[in-house]
Amino acid sequence: MIRCIHLWTGDDQQSHFEEGHIALDPGQRGDLLTGKLATASVSFQETKSGGAFAWHTAPARQLVITLSGTLDFQTREGRHFRLAPGDILFAEDTRGSGHSWTLVDDQPWRRAYVILASTASVPFHPRPAGA
């Protein structure tokens, strides 16, 4: 399983999140994998250690794959979650109040942005309540 945080805009126009994972199915050679996702583009970005970004929404429906750096994300409701290397953020909060983030370790945040096609179905599975 690959840890994934789903971030979306609720009917209240607030950003909300839930922790879960990307579902992987058995593949060749004993590997686990997903099917191919329809994407529009992929880009890479690096932010120096100590970086932060004030309140904003996601510019598009996207997957953000953290390669290095540990971040604290916050919603306007005061809820927090952390992203670490290897984690995926499934960002769908493209409107509303948005979120902010701060780097919390001494590493730069290196990440890949995968902009999803409108037809893309992400195999996100939320963590069961109480787990």
Labelled PLM ranges:
Residues 1-8:
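Short acidic, Pro/Gly- and aromatic-enriched capping/linker segments at domain boundaries
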Residues 9, 21-30, 40-58, 93-96, ...:
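Conserved short histidine dyad/triad with adjacent acidic residue
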Residues 10-11, 66:
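Short, acidic, Ser/Thr-enriched surface-loop or helix-capping motifs
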Residues 32-36, 52-58, 74-75, 81-82, ...:
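Short histidine-centered beta-strand/loop micro-motifs
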Residues 46, 76-94:
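Short acidic-glycine-tyrosine-enriched beta hairpin
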Residues 46-49, 57-73, 114-117:
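Short, conserved beta-strand element in jelly-roll/cupin
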Residues 88-94, 104-121:
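A short hydrophobic beta-strand segment most commonly corresponding to one strand
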